[in-house]
A protein has these predicted regions:
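Hydrophobic residues in well-ordered beta-strands that form the structural core
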Residues: 109-110, 135-137, 249
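Nucleotide donor/acceptor-binding cores
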Residues: 3-5, 106, 133, 163
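C-terminal helix-rich "cap/oligomerization" subdomain common to oxidoreductases
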Residues: 1-5, 49, 83-86, 122, ...
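A contiguous active-site-proximal alpha/beta segment in oxidoreductase catalytic domains
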Residues: 83, 114-173, 325
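Beta-loop-alpha module in the N-terminal Rossmann-like domain of NAD(P)-dependent dehydrogenases
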Residues: 51-54, 58, 63-128
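Rossmann-like dinucleotide-binding domain that binds NAD(P)(H)
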Residues: 161-239, 308-311
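NAD(P)-dinucleotide binding in Rossmann-like oxidoreductases
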Residues: 203-204, 219-289, 303-306
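N-terminal Rossmann-like dinucleotide-binding module
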Residues: 1-62, 294
Length: 328
């Protein structure tokens, strides 16, 4: 359809393409940007760019796609793009975003983190504001209905007073840990006090170490983000404890809802007991995100979260934390 919003995809790795190369009909789940755009009723994927020649050869089987190994050349083939998606490695985001404004897209959707440092992020946001380019960062849990419901339950006090949020994660702080810093930021705001404990780096000497962060809020809530390294099996566990209930989430697959009940044997004591389980439909996150972008572009509906809010996480780890030395 010629009236669809035109999209360019920069980066066709796992989240860009590899995790879901399908072009199924509208309404199904999608685990890559390629699949989510292809299924959308509002968007048309016109061009893709990647430096991997094998991936490009695979994508060339789709006659409707313009495939390039240079994203600049791809963007230069049209006078105007409605949406440009950046799904490249984290450390490349700043350079790409700094140049994208020259091509004047209406909107840019970039994978988290926005950038590796707040100074670069501030510069990018200012440039986009000056050019009138909308910017959205993909913190995927914000586009999952199950997490939105969790936030509402917490804010409405249905689990009592928030006491503790503990998260274990593998991988780097910026690439994986930021998901959960953002979750705490979304649910509780920024902490009053925080400390960071540097962890292990990747064998390729990446600066993105698997750090541990401990935060305290004015309310007394404790947030513990615990990095368990790069070499362990993929593991993300979230546990929340409130005075009247809680929940646990393992690997973003399902929520175990808990409630506070009296202990049968020990009078006067209470425990958290599993109330029900709820599946998390992770495959709907990207379709939901693209619906939000379409509403923004077609109906001028503002994004619920602006890019400056995302930079609060970078500022937190750069300026707001006391960095403690590692112990041997």
């Amino acid at each position: 359809m010629t009236d669809k919003l035109k999209v360019a995809l920069i980066g066709c790795g796992q989240i860009g393409y590899g995790w879901d190369p399908s072009i199924a009909g509208s309404g199904s789940e999608a685990f890559s940007h390629f699949a989510a755009i292809s299924q959308s009723e509002s968007f048309e994927l016109v061009g893709v760019a990647d430096t991997d020649s094998e991936i490009l050869e695979e994508l060339k089987r789709h006659d409707f796609l313009e495939c390039e190994n240079d994203w600049r050349r791809m963007l230069g083939e049209r006078d105007r793009w409605d949406l440009v998606v950046v799904a490249t490695p984290d450390e490349t985001h700043s350079d790409i975003l700094n140049e994208i404004s020259e091509f004047n897209p209406s909107c840019v959707f970039v994978e988290k983190p926005l950038c590796m440092d707040s100074l670069s992020g501030d510069r990018i946001i200012k440039s986009f504001e000056n050019e009138g380019i909308s910017l959205l960062v993909n913190y995927s849990r914000r586009f999952m209905r199950e997490y939105r419901a969790l936030g509402e339950v917490i804010r409405e006090g249905r689990m009592g007073t928030p006491l503790c949020l503990t998260v274990h994660y593998t991988g780097g702080l910026l690439h994986n840990g930021f998901h959960f810093l953002d979750l705490a930021h979304w649910f509780f705001g920024l902490p009053e006090e925080a400390r960071i404990f540097p962890g292990h780096q990747k064998r390729n000497k990446s600066k993105d170490c698997s750090a541990t962060i401990r935060c305290t809020y004015k309310s007394g809530l404790q947030f513990n983000l615990i990095g368990v390294g790069h070499e362990s099996p993929t593991h993300h566990q979230v546990e929340f404890i409130g005075s009247e209930g809680g929940f646990r989430i393992l690997n973003n697959e399902r929520i175990e809802w808990q409630k506070s009940v009296p202990m049968e044997r020990f009078e006067g004591f209470r425990k958290l007991s599993t109330k029900k389980h709820q599946e998390i439909k992770t495959g709907l996150a990207l379709p939901n995100a693209y619906r939000s972008i379409a509403e923004h572009l077609e109906k001028s509906i503002p994004f619920e979260r602006n890019a400056k809010s995302c930079l609060a996480l970078n500022h937190l780890i750069e300026n707001g934390l006391t960095v403690l030395p590692q112990h041997s």
